[in-house]
Amino acid sequence: MNWYSDYKNECKKIIETVSAEIKKSELVIEKDTIQSMFLFELSKIELPYVFKGGTSLSKAYNLIDRFSEDIDLSMNRKLTQSERKTTKEQLIKIAESLGMKLLNPDQVKSRHDYNKYVFVYDSIFSPMPMEIIIETSFYQNVYPIGKHNIGSFVGNFCKNNDITIPVPFEAANVAMNVQSLERTFVDKVFAICDYYIQDMQDRDSRHLYDICKLLPEIKLDKELSYLIDVVRDDRMISKNNPSAQLKYNIPEMLKEIISNHFYERDYRDVTQKLLYEKIDYNQAINEGIAVVAKSDVFVYNK
């Protein structure tokens, strides 16, 4: 069985129509559709999965307008080892039910806090197999969370135009737990500081764009400052989150990132090409981390 089941020709026509109307490529519409089908199946499972990261900003909040192929998942409580094993089995089972194959089985270990599943699927629009990446991270609890509807290009197009498509598409209506905008904002600020300390900029400048888009939705107030301190305490535990250590001053580090143009080349060469809107590097900085750097919300108060 493949993701399009017995409806290959119908799916092809639907995706071509949506692609022409919303000015995004068929491959992007196709991948978004499969992501939604995956999340729909995941939403039926009892374990407390939480959808987070950049793709959630697009599919749950309709906030960003860039290409994102990853689905980032976590949980809102600590898992037992048995549940971790079950998680691995569930994700692979869902993928296989959609005709996808796991490319890196030897690199996925249920005992690990972080795993990257690389699945491939047969595309209607490409002779080459295409990838969908599912990332799971269980080293931190996810909070705050809320129930949100998960959108898709096909589902949104049908809803906006009052169209009923001639194929089953239950994934047009998906509701699941999603990490809050505030927490995603906090995580992304810490992430760009972590990568700066680790001298890693390749493909990480996308966070600058996301922060720029998140900031108008975020209040830089005492409530956010409290959340930042709580998240920082959690992040301190992991060696993979160096900027959470108290020896680092986040506002000053953001100023260094700006003055050193640390992410500029990657933003121009990679991130800007993934955007469906015109936001250049300077705008992303000036309307994003430059504003955060002038604020005191990331000053640790405990």
Give the residues covered by each predicted segment.
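Structured mid-to-C-terminal alpha-helical surface segments
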Residues: M1-Y49, K59-D65, N76-K302
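Glycine-rich beta-strand-to-loop/alpha-helix junction loops that act as flexible
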Residues: F51-T55
